[in-house]
């Protein structure tokens, strides 16, 4: 009884060991490791891009100096708030159009306080930033999605070939072989179709030549009969 149990346990252990190291299980483990590595690589790239973009925006915001407000901006600050409160459904572009129209309708006397305030703010700005020159902001160019996708694909392929070179190359060879088989089958079908068309064309020309020979022999046989007819009636009998 003990020997039977031991032999059964050893057999089960061998089966489990063979299953663990079977090609299907190894391929499944390789696929899982490849997906995990590729996701980590993509996440690292996206995190680095976001970090660099955030640092660039922070540096540009710290170094950027705002322009001094002109008379229209000084006037429109308070007026924009009132218009937005009175008409909450209006969009910002519509409010800007309305403010521009109202500013044009103001008289010089009504605009004078705002010009004076703008001159005061300009003097303060010159004292604070003596060497200031207006430089408009440039929008940061985002990397193209296609380039990011290509880099991630290349990274995934490199990781796969580095981790499991034999499995990856075998899969590529199988894919190439299947593509060659499909192209060969297509070329064979094209050759067969062309040969059938040539045969049909040749048979049609053969039948046409046979009909011509038959017609000529028939006309030569009936030629004495046509000579015996009158000149006006011979054309009526030539038609078949």
Curated annotation (Swiss-Prot):
BP GO terms, sorted: cell differentiation; male sex determination; sex differentiation
Superkingdom in the source lineage: Eukaryota
SUPFAM superfamilies: HMG-box (SSF47095)
SMART domains in alphabetical order: HMG
GO terms for MF: calmodulin binding; DNA-binding transcription activator activity, RNA polymerase II-specific; RNA polymerase II cis-regulatory region sequence-specific DNA binding
Region named Disordered: 37-63
Keyword vocabulary terms for this entry: Activator, Calmodulin-binding, Cytoplasm, Differentiation, DNA-binding, Nucleus, Repressor, Sexual differentiation, Transcription, Transcription regulation
Bias type Basic and acidic residues, positions: 46-58
Gene Ontology terms: cellular component: cytoplasm; nuclear speck; nucleus
Compartments in which it is found: Nucleus speckle; Cytoplasm; Nucleus
CDD domains in UniProt: HMG-box_SoxA_SoxB_SoxG
Major localisation: nucleus
Residue ranges of DNA binding: 65-133
Assembly information from the UniProt record: Interacts with CALM, EP300, HDAC3, KPNB1, ZNF208 isoform KRAB-O, PARP1, SLC9A3R2 and WT1. The interaction with EP300 modulates its DNA-binding activity. The interaction with KPNB1 is sensitive to dissociation by Ran in the GTP-bound form. Interaction with PARP1 impaired its DNA-binding activity.
Family as reported in the entry's similarity comment: Belongs to the SRY family.
The protein's role, per its UniProt record: Transcriptional regulator that controls a genetic switch in male development. It is necessary and sufficient for initiating male sex determination by directing the development of supporting cell precursors (pre-Sertoli cells) as Sertoli rather than granulosa cells. Involved in different aspects of gene regulation including promoter activation or repression. Binds to the DNA consensus sequence 5'-[AT]AACAA[AT]-3'. SRY HMG box recognizes DNA by partial intercalation in the minor groove and promotes DNA bending. Also involved in pre-mRNA splicing.
Protein name from the UniProt record: Sex-determining region Y protein
Lineage: Eukaryota, Metazoa, Chordata, Craniata, Vertebrata
């Amino acid at each position: 009884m003990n020997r039977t149990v031991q032999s059964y346990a050893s057999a089960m252990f061998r089966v489990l060991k063979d299953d663990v190291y079977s090609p299907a299980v190894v391929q499944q483990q390789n696929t899982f490791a490849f997906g995990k590595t590729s996701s980590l690589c993509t996440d690292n790239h996206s995190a680095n891009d976001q970090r660099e973009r955030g640092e660039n925006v922070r540096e540009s915001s710290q170094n950027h100096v705002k322009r001094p407000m002109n008379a229209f901006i000084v006037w429109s600050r308070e007026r924009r708030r009132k218009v937005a409160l009175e008409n909450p459904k209006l969009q910002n572009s519509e409010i800007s159009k309305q403010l521009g129209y109202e500013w044009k309708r103001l008289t010089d006397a009504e605009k004078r306080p705002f010009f004076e305030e703008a001159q005061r703010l300009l003097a303060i700005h010159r004292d604070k930033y003596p060497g200031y020159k207006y430089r408009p902001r440039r929008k940061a160019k985002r990397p193209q999605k296609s380039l990011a996708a290509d880099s991630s694909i290349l990274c995934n392929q490199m990781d796969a070939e580095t981790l499991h070179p034999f499995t990856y190359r075998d899969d590529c060879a199988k894919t190439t072989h299947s593509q060659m088989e499909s192209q060969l089958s297509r070329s064979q079908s094209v050759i067969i179709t062309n040969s059938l068309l040539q045969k049909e064309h040749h048979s049609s020309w053969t039948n046409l030549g046979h009909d011509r020979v038959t017609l000529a022999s028939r006309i030569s046989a009936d030629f004495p009969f046509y000579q015996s007819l009158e000149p006006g009636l011979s054309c009526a009998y030539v038609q078949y």
